[in-house]
Amino acid sequence: MPKRTDIHKIMVIGSGPIIIGQAAEFDYSGTQACLALKELDYEVVLVNSNPATIMTDKEIADQVYLEPITLEFVSQILRKEHPDAILPTLGGQQGLNMAMELSKSGILDELHIELLGTKLSAIDQAEDREQFKALMEELGEPVPASGIARTVDEALAFAKQAGYPVIVRPAFTMGGTGGGIAETPQQLHDITENGLALSPVTQVLIEQSIAGYKEIEFEVMRDAADNAMVVCNMENFDPVGIHTGDSIVYAPVQTLADREVQLLRDAALKIIRALKIEGGCNVQLALDPNSFNYYIIEVNPRVSRSSALASKATGYPIAKMAAKIAVGLHLDEIKNPVTGTTYAEFEPALDYVVCKIPRWPFDKFTHADRRLGTQMKATGEVMAIGRNIEEATLKAVRSLEIGVHHVEEPALRSVDDDVLSDKLIHAQDDRLFYLTEAIRRGYPIDELAELTKINVFFLDKLLHIIEIEQALRTHTDDIETLTVAKRNGFADQTVADYWHETIDQVRDFRLAHKLAPVYKMVDTCAGEFASETPYYYGTYEFENESIVTKRPSVLVLGSGPIRIGQGVEFDYATVHSVKAIQKAGYEAIIMNSNPETVSTDFSVSDKLYFEPLTIEDVLNVIELEKPVGVIVQFGGQTAINLAKPLADHGIKILGTSVADVNRAEDRDEFDKVIKALAIPQPAGDTASDEATALAIADKLGYPVLVRPSYVLGGRAMEIVKKRTDLDYYMHNAVKVSHDHPVLVDSYLVGKECEVDAICDGQTVLIPGIMEHIERAGVHSGDSMAVYPPQSLSAAVQAQIVDYTEKLAIALNCVGMMNIQFVIHDDQVYVIEVNPRASRTVPFLSKVTNIPMAQVATRAILDQSLAEQGYQTGLVTPGPLVHVKAPVFSFSKLNRVDSLLGPEMKSTGEVMGSDVTMAKALYKAFEAAKLHVPSHGNVLLTVRDEDKPETVALAKRFHALGYQLLATRGTATALTTHGLPVTTVDKIDSGERDLLHRMEAGEIQVVINTVSDEEQAENDGTLIRNTSIMHGIPLFTALDTVAAILQVRESQSFVTQAL
C-alpha cells in the first residue's frame, strides 16, 4: 500500500532532556524519523525541550518547537498547528506518556488527531502491567507469577504468598525507574513506596524473581498488512535481574541452539502481531538455561535504546523504517538504504559479533551505590564490532575510556578471595574485571558460572583471553603469538605491558611484519548482495573492503560514550563539523564508538569507522585513509586528549595547534599569556605535591578552589574551606592528575558567565555571552544560563568582549574556544579558557541562529570569518530571553548527594524561551520537571552564612501565600524578622519529624544549603535524598530559589485589604 494521502501534517514528540535510561538514542531515532517523513513530503512539526540535539535543528523538521513536553505546552502547539496525526513512538517513554496524557485530556478527539504507529490500546496493553499480563495469558505466552499492587500492603501480601525474592516493576516508567529486586519485606516496602511514587498511574507489578535466566531481546518490525520480521536478536552477558541497559550485550545471540532461537522468535512475532503495532517494537524474554522454558519479561511498544543498538549493529535503520510504516508503507515497498537493491522485509544477517558495554557515572559519583539491579544506572554505552567475541569485547573495553585498555584492573590483584567472591555474586559495574581476576587466580569457570549465573560459554571466552595473556608473557617479540593476540582484540598497549616494551616498539614490530588491520563493511546481508554503505569496522584478517578515494579527506574524532561532563552536545558539534567539511568539498570521515548518536548514523558522513578512540585505532585508520588532517575540537576531552599523541606521530591537527592548546590548559604556560595581556585572574598557583598545595592555600587564604589540570566536567574539583579538608582532598585528587599538577586558586564569590567564540586566527566572532544564575562555585554545566545577559552592565560586557578577543588572538586560536569568567566587585576575572567546542555550543547555536560548529570548521579549513559573511565582535541579540536549565538523574542513583558544587552532576539540559525572563524561566523549570505548586509548605534549612539572604527569600514566599516551615536555627532567624514560621524537629525525633512530613506529602518545596559540620551534612543528605525519592522540588542554591520566586511572582496578583 502506498503512503497515506489523507494526512499531510504530522507532529513528532521528542524525548526531552537526557536522563539515565533515556539518552542520545532518541535524538538519533527522532532525527531519522523526521527526515524520513519529510522525504515522503509530509509537513513535520517537532516538539522537544532539549537544545543539545540535532533533532531540534531547523532543517530537520518544517516547524521546530523547543518547548516543554507538558500537557499545557503541547496542547497549545496542537491548537496552533492543527496536525492530522502524532507519531509518539520515537520519543522514548516521554513521548509515549505524553501521547497517553493528550488522549486522556480529550484534545486529540476534539481536534480529530490520530496516533500513528502504535494505537493507544497497544501502549496500554504493553505498559499497563495488569493488561499486559492478561494479554500474555490470552496468547498462551508464559509470564512469571505476579500480582498488581497499588499500595505497599498489596505488594507485601503477594510476596508473602509467593515467597521472596520478588521483582518490582512500576508501570509507564523507563530504565527500570523505581524498580528493584526485594529479598526481604523491608526492602519490598521501600522499593514499592518509591515505585508507586514514580509511576504516573501509581501501579507496580510484583513478580516472582526469575533472576539467573538468560536474558534475550528481539527487535521486531510489523506493517499494516501484518508482515512481521526480526531485525536483530541480542543476548545479555548478564543474566535476568540486571537491567538490559546496565548489561553487556552481544548481537547476534551466542549461546542458543537453533530450536531455542525459533521458539523465542515465534513468541516475539506473535506478540507484535497481537498488539497490532505498526513500526518497531522490542521484546525482552527470559530463557531457562537448563530447559526450553521461557518467560516474556516485557515489551516496549516503541523505538528504544535497544533499537538504536540493533540499528547500528546491523546497519538496518529501524527508526527510519518505523516512520515510513507508520504512514502506511509496507515492508515489501521500502528499499533497504544499505544495499539499495533489497527491500526492508529481508531480515539482516551478521557475519561479525557486536558487543555493547554500558558506561557508568561512578568515576564522578564515588559514593554512589554501584550494585546493579533492575533499575538502570548507566549514562551511556559503547559498541564494538569484531570477528569473534574476544575481539568485540576487548575493543569495547578500550572504548569505555575508564583508564584501562584491557580486561585487567591492576588494583584488583590485592583484593582478598572473600571480597572477590562477594563482588562476583553481587554484580557491580566492574564485574567483568573481577571475573577475569578470578580466572587468573585459577577459579574454575564452572564454579564461576554457578556463582554468577553467567553462561559458561562467555566465561570460556574470557578464559581464552587469559590464555593469550600467558602466551604473550612467555613469547616476547613473537609474531605468531602477536597475530593470535591481535585477532582476538588485544591492544598494542596491552602487548607492550606483557613484553615490557613501549607501545611504539610493539607498533613498529607489528608493521615491520606487515600485521595491520583491514576494514570490513557493515552491509546488513553478510556479503550476500552488493552493498554501498560507507560503514566499517577494523579486524585482523585478509581482505580490506574500505576503498580509499582520490578526494582529499578530513577525519573528525567523535566524543565516545555519553557520560556526565561529556554529553550529546559534543556529538551535535561533530555532526555539524562534518556538514561543513562536506560543503567545503572534502570527504568527511567520522570515527566514533557510541551506538546511540547521530554521528554514528552511516548516512551522516562519507565514511564511518566504528572503532575505539585510542591512539592505536586512530593511527590505523589514518594509515589507510591518509586524510589531510584531523579535527579534534568537537569531540570533547576524548578527542583533545588524542591531539598530542597524534601530533607526536607527525599527524596534522587542524585548527588550534597542540602547542597552543597546551598554552591554554597548562597552568604555568597560561599564566605567562594572561600576564602579558594584563588580564586579571584569581590568584593561584600549581602544586605537584601535598606540602606545596597546603603552603599555597595558606598564602592565599581559605576558601580555595582546587582542581587537577586537563579535565572536563569539573572532575575532582572542590571548594575547600579549611586546611584539614585540603589535606584529605590531596590524598584523593592527586591520583587523578597523571603527571599533571593540581591547581590551587583563590575562590572568588561572584557572578559567573561564559562565552563561546570562533576565531579564524585573525578575527574573533562572539555569538553571545551567557550569564549564569547560580553564583561561582556551581559547575557551569549545572548552572542555569541566560542569554542575553540580564544583569551585566554594558561596561562589564565590553570588558568580557575585549578579554575574549585578546585571548583568542594571543593563543592563536583557529576554530572554537570557550572562556569562563567571574565578576567580583565589578571586576571581570578569567577562570579558565578551553580551546575547543564546549557543551553550550548547541544552545548558543539555536538561540543566535549561527551554526557555530560549521562556522568554526570552515575557519579551520582556512575560510576567514569575513569570507563567510560574518562581522567580528559581539553579535547583537534578538528580542527573546533564553534560559538553559540542567536536568539531573538523582532518582536513579542511590547515595549520590544532590548538593551542587564545582563537580558536574547533571546528565542533560532543557531550554525555555520567551519575551520576558520570568516566562523563559517558567518554561525551563517546567521542561526540567521542577514544578513548584502555587501554594503549600516551604521547608527551609540553611547554613548560618546564608541566613540573611534566606530571610529575604522567605519574605517573598510569605507574600505569595506559602506557609513557612524551618529547622530550629533557620526558624529563629526568620521569627526575628517577624515571619510566621512552624519549627520542625530535626531527623530522628519521632512522628512529626522532617522526613515523616516529607513522606506524608506535607512539604511542597525544600530549600537546603549545607554547612561544614559533619552531622548537619548527614542530616542534609537525608533531607535531600528524601525529597528526591518523593519528587519534591529541591533547591541547594539560593540563586535558583530567587529565579523560581521571580516566576511565581510574575504569575500572581496582589491581594490587599484596604
Curated annotation (Swiss-Prot):
Pathway: Amino-acid biosynthesis; L-arginine biosynthesis; carbamoyl phosphate from bicarbonate: step 1/1; Pyrimidine metabolism; UMP biosynthesis via de novo pathway; (S)-dihydroorotate from bicarbonate: step 1/3. Residues 1-401 are annotated as: Carboxyphosphate synthetic domain. Residues 930-1058 are annotated as: Allosteric domain. Mg(2+) 1 binds at residues 284, 298. Mg(2+) 3 binds at residues 820, 832. Residues 930-1058 form the MGS-like domain. Residues 547-929 are annotated as: Carbamoyl phosphate synthetic domain. Mn(2+) 1 binds at residues 284, 298. Residues 402-546 are annotated as: Oligomerization domain. It is an enzyme of class 6 (ligase). Mg(2+) 2 binds at residues 298, 300. Disulfide bonds: none annotated. Mg(2+) 4 binds at residues 832, 834. Mn(2+) 4 binds at residues 832, 834. Composed of two chains; the small (or glutamine) chain promotes the hydrolysis of glutamine to ammonia, which is used by the large (or ammonia) chain to synthesize carbamoyl phosphate. Tetramer of heterodimers (alpha,beta)4. This is Carbamoyl phosphate synthase pyrimidine-specific large chain. It comes from Lactiplantibacillus plantarum (strain ATCC BAA-793 / NCIMB 8826 / WCFS1).
